[in-house]
């Protein structure tokens, strides 16, 4: 029951947004596949994602499916061949789902590694204390060959609920299937910066919900920081094996010290007003909880809401060491964040030491209204080697690349939709994509097809069906 109710809660948030003035409307007829592609300006690669059809898809730039695995990942993760002794095309996914209709996300029995041909080369789940993996929201292969998983457990959380509730636990699992390290969100409730008012509202929310959320803070991201310039300069908070997480429900981003388990860095959940701080050679000012669509950078981070995919940009990529995050502006927070009328999401690149925004993307940067780019839940953003950013506007299944100036140079709409029963017990057609991963050409077998033909979009005002 926990698995189903958790996903129902996740998807009902989206339904609430759709039924209020906080959301854009999606047309009933729209093109799918690649709709924009400029090979000269785009970073050319494959893209990996799982879709509501239950499969994991690998596409080329022209939107052709070049490979498929008949397993779902939340998210799927393709491994660098350096992590697989040179074998190409291995992915981490959920192998066996739970019995409930939505069990594949919160109640899965096993996760594992598949090779290019779909053969299982590593699996884990039956060895877990509950006999099930229950992995959700993130999975990562570590440099030592172990695997880091974000899972769901039930237990009372001090100061939140005396009854057992669904909490989230990070586990590190060895190649042999042994748990060698754990960290549980509920054990650190006093370190997340939740105000007394927020703590009271959090307790009331769990009393009203009968403790059936799928993870009471909805930690949706869990990534090792990796090598970075801050640690190299002596800042131990950014040790490479420390872990960055973010909470969708409480709107904070934090770093876990791997050695002590303590939170050693945090952004949010509540943002001060009128602060000034020096970022580099410029003075950055946070003038209010939002101006939501201020284009001035650098400036201090203003209020985020329901963000996803917070991570440190890896070494070797442009702006390495900065934090990149998809700020959804979805309903979130204890107390709830006051959202803007002109709903729109943002991609924020943040200097984690000064907490200043040094680059951002909104729909406005693509000469669209703010609401032209919006996903109230799920979604991701990844920096590419040429400086572009790959964005997953998850709610609408739209994947696209933008340049630093905001020009859209590649766009793809997920065609792999399915009818699903949501909170109202009615079937709806959904094509959402939780996360998208750019895949270098040399990560897959050499004979994998690849097409790079330019696609010029039509003039929308003259594009009609007959």
Describe the residue ranges of each PLM region.
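Histidine-/acidic-rich catalytic cores in large beta-rich domains
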Residues: 24-466
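Bacterial N-terminal signal peptides
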Residues: 8-18
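Bacterial N-terminal signal peptides that target proteins for export
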Residues: 1-9
């Amino acid at each position: 029951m926990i698995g189903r109710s958790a996903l129902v809660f996740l998807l009902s948030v989206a339904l609430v947004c759709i039924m209020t003035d906080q959301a854009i409307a999606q047309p009933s007829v729209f093109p799918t596949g690649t709709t924009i592609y400029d090979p000269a300006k785009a970073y050319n690669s494959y893209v990996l994602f799982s879709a509501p059809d239950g499969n994991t898809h690998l596409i080329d730039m022209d939107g052709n499916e070049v490979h498929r695995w008949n397993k779902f990942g939340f998210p799927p993760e393709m491994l660098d061949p350096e992590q697989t002794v040179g074998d190409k095309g291995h992915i981490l996914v959920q192998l066996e789902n739970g019995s409930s209709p939505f069990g594949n996300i919160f109640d899965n029995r096993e996760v594992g590694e598949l090779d290019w041909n779909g053969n299982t080369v590593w699996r884990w789940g039956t060895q877990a204390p509950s006999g099930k993996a229950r992995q959700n929201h993130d999975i990562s292969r570590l440099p030592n060959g172990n695997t880091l998983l974000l899972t769901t457990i039930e237990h009372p959380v001090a100061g939140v609920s005396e009854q057992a509730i669904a909490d989230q636990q990070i586990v590190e699992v060895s190649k042999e299937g042994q748990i060698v390290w754990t960290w549980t969100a509920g054990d650190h409730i006093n370190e997340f910066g939740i105000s007394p008012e927020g703590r009271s509202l959090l307790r009331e929310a769990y009393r009203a919900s009968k403790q059936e959320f799928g993870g009471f803070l909805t930690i949706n991201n869990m990534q090792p920081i990796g090598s970075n310039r801050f640690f190299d300069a002596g800042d131990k908070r950014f040790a490479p094996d420390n872990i960055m997480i973010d909470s969708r429900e409480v709107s904070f981003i934090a770093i876990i010290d791997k050695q002590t388990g303590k939170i050693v860095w945090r952004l949010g959940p509540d943002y001060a007003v009128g602060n000034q701080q020096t970022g580099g050679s410029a003075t950055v000012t946070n003038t209010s909880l939002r101006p939501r669509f201020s284009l001035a950078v650098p400036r201090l981070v203003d209020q985020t809401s329901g963000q996803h995919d917070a991570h440190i940009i890896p070494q070797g990529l442009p702006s390495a060491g900065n934090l990149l995050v998809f700020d959804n502006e979805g309903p979130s927070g204890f107390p709830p964040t006051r959202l803007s009328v002109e709903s729109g999401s943002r991609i924020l690149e943040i200097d984690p030491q000064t907490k200043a925004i040094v680059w951002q993307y909104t729909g406005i940067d693509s000469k669209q209204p703010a609401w032209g780019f919006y996903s109230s839940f799920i979604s991701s953003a990844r920096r590419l080697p040429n400086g572009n950013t790959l964005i997953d506007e998850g709610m609408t299944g739209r994947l696209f690349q933008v340049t630093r100036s905001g020009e859209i140079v590649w766009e793809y709409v997920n065609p792999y939709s399915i009818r699903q029963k949501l909170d109202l017990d009615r079937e709806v057609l959904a094509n959402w994509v939780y996360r998208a991963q750019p895949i270098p050409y040399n990560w897959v077998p050499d004979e994998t097809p690849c097409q790079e033909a330019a696609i010029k979009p039509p003039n929308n005002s003259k594009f009609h069906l007959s």
